[in-house]
UniProtKB/Swiss-Prot annotation:
GO biological process: one example: innate immune response
Native organism: Sphecius speciosus (Eastern cicada killer)
Protein name, per record: Apidaecin A
Keyword set includes Secreted: yes
Induction record: By bacterial infection.
Transmembrane segments: none
Amino acid sequence: NRPTYVPAPPRPPHPRL
């Protein structure tokens, strides 16, 4: 059986430097 895939939580966009 495949382990349950847990997607990573959405991250805030990186500021344009």
